[in-house]
């Protein structure tokens, strides 16, 4: 796919998200499209950062609307609701399509990456204990 076609898909997806969620803080694309490794049957992976305490009211409708407009499958995640590992993937390898307030978004991203670093240290401790004792937690 040429870059202009990819950009048109990004623009359409972003505009569809913002029409449904005008209060969104940020919209990202991640996965194969963000890496430029998409195929004709690749889906478009979108992550949305909403204000605190707000969630996507009708996720399936939003996914359907995006898919209809870009003429391919799409997947949408609420960045506040996903796990630390997926959140890190979006923030490290994704591409930002929209930011309402770059300073606010950057502060949230920094906090999210800090949470991931703490999570990673916890997992490292669990794995070290398991390697040392051969016993997992809960046994």
Residue ranges and their predicted role:
Residues 1-26, 34-40, 51-139:
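Catalytic core of pol beta-like nucleotidyltransferases
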Residues 45-48:
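Short beta-strand->loop micro-motif that forms the acidic, two-metal-ion catalytic signature
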């Amino acid at each position: 796919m040429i870059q202009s076609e990819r950009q048109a898909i990004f623009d359409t997806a972003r505009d569809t998200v913002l029409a449904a969620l005008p209060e969104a803080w940020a919209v990202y694309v991640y996965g194969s499209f963000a890496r430029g490794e998409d195929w004709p049957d690749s889906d478009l992976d979108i992550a949305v950062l909403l204000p605190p305490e707000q969630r996507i009211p009708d996720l399936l409708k939003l996914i359907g609307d995006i898919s209809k407009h870009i003429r391919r499958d799409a997947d949408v995640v609420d960045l506040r609701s996903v796990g630390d590992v997926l959140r890190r993937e979006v923030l490290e390898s994704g591409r930002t399509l929209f930011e309402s307030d770059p300073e606010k978004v950057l502060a949230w991203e920094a906090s999210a990456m800090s949470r991931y670093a703490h999570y990673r240290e916890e997992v490292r401790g669990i794995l070290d204990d398991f390697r040392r004792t051969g016993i997992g937690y809960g046994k």
